[in-house]
Amino acid sequence: MENINKIPVVINGAGGKMGREVVKAVAGAADMEIIAAVDKNPALLGQDAGEIAGCGAVEVPIVNDLEASLVMATQSKIQGVMVDFTHPSGVYANTRAAIAYGVRPVVGTTGLSEEQINDLKEFAEKASTGALIIPNFSIGVVLLQQASLQAAKYFDHVEIIELHHNQKADAPSGTAIKTAQMLAELGKQFNPAEVEEKEEMPGAKGAVTEDNIRIHSVRLPGLIAHQEMIFGAPGQIYTLRHDTSDRSCYMPGVLLSIRKVTELNTLVYGLENIL
């Protein structure tokens, strides 16, 4: 039975690797309650979300009906939150649906375009509904990005290498794109050409942003999530790197985001903006 003093949480993508971690984290949070767990995997339907996650029964079966779950979240005295870890192909529609129902989305799924993010921000503002899009929930990644901003003031050459498991659908990663955007806000042009460049194979030197920052994506089994920032100057190389060894590292950021989104009335992009 729903506790009126707890934040009601809908977990979309509850059967995935990140979704299962979210189930465990929310189930263990004293101020939150899982009211719905959604997943499209037919093999999981009807099973207890907690049992699937490995944290014991939470008495919430996995369903494949996001709309009904959002309706359930609107019936609480405390405004509900939807956490989305699904797929790039569906995240825009999921997020827009949550806002339309007055349920505050916390989006960890990457792959949203800049145009889609701007549209969702406008939609959230019109609805006066808080929303969070977080490319990476790790506090360590926020520190990597902040250190990169400091380094970029003194280095004109930088490349980003992001490495993920081979089941990640989008490339570059949302974290790499966000990091490049943060560097671009410094207002400088990176990687001035020293020679006339020629790629024998298109894309050999990585994807290039408008500010001439190169991003390289690696997808291999055995990886989880990693990002390396390589800064270069005559006579020196400065390297920053963050490695994720377990998805549990994201959960403090997820729980913080669930709590913070209830205080917002617009869309915020990036964990660093709510810390």
Swiss-Prot record:
GO biological processes: diaminopimelate biosynthetic process; lysine biosynthetic process via diaminopimelate
Catalysed transformations (reactions): (S)-2,3,4,5-tetrahydrodipicolinate + NAD(+) + H2O = (2S,4S)-4-hydroxy-2,3,4,5-tetrahydrodipicolinate + NADH + H(+); (S)-2,3,4,5-tetrahydrodipicolinate + NADP(+) + H2O = (2S,4S)-4-hydroxy-2,3,4,5-tetrahydrodipicolinate + NADPH + H(+)
Record-listed NAD(+) binding positions: G13, A14, G15, G16, K17, M18, G108, T109, T110
Family matches, as InterPro entries: DapB_C, DapB_N, DapB_N_CS, DHDPR_bac, NAD(P)-bd_dom_sf
GO cellular component: cytosol
A GO term for molecular function: 4-hydroxy-tetrahydrodipicolinate reductase
Binding sites annotated in the UniProt record for (S)-2,3,4,5-tetrahydrodipicolinate: H165, G174, T175
EC number per UniProt: 1.17.1.8
SUPFAM superfamilies per the UniProt record, alphabetical: Glyceraldehyde-3-phosphate dehydrogenase-like, C-terminal domain (SSF55347), NAD(P)-binding Rossmann-fold domains (SSF51735)
Functional pathway: Amino-acid biosynthesis; L-lysine biosynthesis via DAP pathway; (S)-tetrahydrodipicolinate from L-aspartate: step 4/4
Main subcellular localisation: cytoplasm
Active-site feature positions: H164, K168
Listed HAMAP family: DapB
Sequence similarity: Belongs to the DapB family.
PANTHER family for the chain: 4-HYDROXY-TETRAHYDRODIPICOLINATE REDUCTASE 1, CHLOROPLASTIC-RELATED (PTHR20836:SF0), DIHYDRODIPICOLINATE REDUCTASE (PTHR20836)
Protein's UniProt name: 4-hydroxy-tetrahydrodipicolinate reductase
Protein source organism: Picosynechococcus sp. (strain ATCC 27264 / PCC 7002 / PR-6)
Organism placement in taxonomy: Bacteria, Bacillati, Cyanobacteriota, Cyanophyceae, Oscillatoriophycideae
Encoding gene, per UniProt annotation: dapB
